[in-house]
From Swiss-Prot:
Specific pancreatic alpha-amylase (AMY2A) inhibitor. The recombinant peptide inhibits human pancreatic (Ki=0.01 nM) and porcine pancreatic alpha-amylases (Ki=0.1 nM). It is found in: Secreted. The keyword Manganese does not apply. Coiled coil: none annotated. The keyword Disulfide bond applies. Is structurally homologous to beta-defensins. This is Alpha-amylase inhibitor helianthamide. Keywords: Alpha-amylase inhibitor, Disulfide bond, Pharmaceutical, Secreted. GO terms for molecular function: alpha-amylase inhibitor activity. Residues 7-10 are annotated as: Inhibitory motif. It comes from Stichodactyla helianthus.
């Protein structure tokens, strides 16, 4: 199940999910995610 893509900042985007994996960061409160978390990984 994949959700909407969510944009964090330049060069970093994630996927809206109900819960994030252990190696992912989570950003809450993004409108595009409709109450879910935006799960993303930073490239560094």
């Amino acid at each position: 199940e994949s959700g909407n893509s969510c944009y964090i900042y330049h060069g970093v985007s994630g996927i809206c999910k109900a819960s994030c994996a252990e190696d992912e960061k989570a950003m809450a409160g993004m409108g595009v995610c409709e109450g879910h978390l935006c799960c993303y990984k930073t490239p560094w």
